[in-house]
Each structure stands twice: as C-alpha cells, then as structure tokens.
Amino acid sequence: MRHQCRVPQLGRPADQRKAMLRALTTQLIREGRVTTTKARAKALRDEAERMITLAKDGSLASRRRAIGYIYDKQLVHALFDKAPTRYGERKGGYTRITRTVPRRGDNAEMAIIELV
C-alpha cells in the first residue's frame, strides 16, 4: 500500500516517469512554457525549481548535477548564465501553473506551466 508516499505516480513505471519529467523539464527551460495535464505540471514544478536553484548556486557540482538531469548540455550552460540575473533575489516560486480548458479527447484537466 502507498500510505503517505509523496511521489506522484502519474500512471507510469518509475523509469518512464523519470524520463518524462526530464523531457518536460528540458522543454520548459527551452521554451519557457509547456501545456500538459495538471498532475504532470505539479510534478514538473518540483523538478524545474530544483534545476533553477542549482543554476542560481552556480558551482561546478551544481552544473554537473544539472547536466546529468537536463537532456541538452548547451541549454544547461545557458540556464546557468541567465538564472542568477533573472532569479537573483527570488527565494523560490520560479514557475506559475495556470489551469486551462479540459482536453477534448478524455476531459483531462489541463494546465500551462511557465517560468515567471
């Protein structure tokens, strides 16, 4: 039984869930906004904010952790260059989740997650 497990399952095995969140995080950092389901957006928020916090730190160890998570190495370098100036005094809350209309096919709750 999954009593008090805080990780959202998202209907996938662990390896597929991790790959999906890595891909969504990479796309969010590249594009600035992603349209996805509400549950995925909430799970994505934790990962994206963790990567931005690493970028604000700016150390070599933080850069290596981000390179190990984000699929595009050049995107990591760009994030580490612009994050300290863009989010310097902000302590958290780097993303915003906005609910949109339900998906037409299965009526799933949709949301737009974007970088603030």
From Swiss-Prot:
The keyword Ribonucleoprotein applies. Part of the 50S ribosomal subunit. Contacts protein L32. This is Large ribosomal subunit protein bL17. Belongs to the bacterial ribosomal protein bL17 family. The keyword Ribonucleoprotein applies. Keywords: Ribonucleoprotein, Ribosomal protein. PANTHER family: LARGE RIBOSOMAL SUBUNIT PROTEIN BL17M, RIBOSOMAL PROTEIN L17. GO terms for biological process: translation. One of its GO terms (cellular component) is cytosolic large ribosomal subunit. Transmembrane segments: none annotated. NCBIfam families: L17 (TIGR00059). GO terms for molecular function: structural constituent of ribosome.
